[in-house]
């Protein structure tokens, strides 16, 4: 028994140090450390966006919030020459509202909403297979902003029906938006109910 105690203590110390190390890596990580794939299958390096203001959104084609594509594209057109990049990540984790292939999603967005901002490959945003950049975004901005009683009620409803939510920081639904400043800081997280026009001033303040 006495021989087991040092071994157990050593194992616990190692585990704690490992957790601390992993936490430090998360804290020290930059959004520019991440890579992903676009909807054509080509690698996208977030370092290429250094110095830009980013608005990163998980999207879906058959959602009640899908009309927000129009507002996101309008925001992109208004501010892209000043350094804004809107990045869409189609996601099928919420009620199966993004069932199409990457090609079908792109066609839908182009024909129905005139989308020209970059679309990434369809990805998970919660759970064990979540796109790593979303794990980073959620860690940096674990709570979302919403306005008024309507926003509060909508958030409560989405939290009740979303099956992919396991942690408080998890994304509740489609069209959650993360605003990232020019230096890579995750400044704000906007709820699905927040229309692009609602936070246009926040975007402009970053430019």
Could you tell me what each predicted segment is?
Residues 1-4:
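Positively charged n-region of N-terminal signal peptides that target proteins for export
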Residues 7-17:
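Bacterial N-terminal signal peptides
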Residues 20-47, 67:
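N-terminal "domain-start" segment that seeds a small globular fold
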Residues 52-53, 61-62, 66-90, 109-113:
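Conserved helix-turn-beta segment immediately C-terminal to the redox Cys motif
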Residues 83-100, 116-127:
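Thiol-based oxidoreductase modules, predominantly thioredoxin-like and allied folds used
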Residues 114-193:
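Thiol/selenol-based redox catalytic cores and closely related redox-interacting motifs
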Residues 187-207:
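Non-catalytic, surface beta->alpha helical segment in thiol-disulfide oxidoreductase systems
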């Amino acid at each position: 028994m006495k021989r087991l105690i040092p071994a157990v203590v050593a194992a616990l110390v190692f585990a704690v140090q490992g957790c601390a190390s992993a936490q430090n890596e998360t804290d020290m990580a930059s959004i520019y450390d991440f890579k992903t794939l676009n909807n054509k299958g080509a690698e996208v390096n977030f370092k290429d966006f250094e110095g830009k203001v980013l608005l990163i959104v998980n999207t879906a084609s058959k959602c009640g919030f899908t009309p927000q594509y129009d507002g996101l594209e309008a925001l992109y057109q208004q501010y892209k020459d000043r350094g804004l990049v809107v990045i869409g990540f189609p996601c099928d984790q919420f009620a199966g509202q993004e069932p199409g292939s990457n090609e079908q999603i792109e066609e839908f967005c182009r024909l129905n909403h005139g989308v020209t901002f970059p679309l990434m490959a369809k990805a998970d945003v919660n759970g064990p297979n979540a796109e790593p950049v979303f794990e980073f975004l959620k860690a940096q901005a674990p709570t979302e902003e919403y306005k008024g009683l309507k926003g509060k009620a909508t958030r409560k409803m989405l939290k009740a029906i979303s099956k992919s939510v396991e942690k408080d920081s998890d994304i509740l639904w489609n069209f959650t938006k993360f605003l990232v400043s020019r230096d890579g800081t995750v400044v704000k997280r906007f709820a699905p109910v927040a229309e692009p026009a609602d936070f246009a001033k926040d975007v402009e303040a970053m430019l």
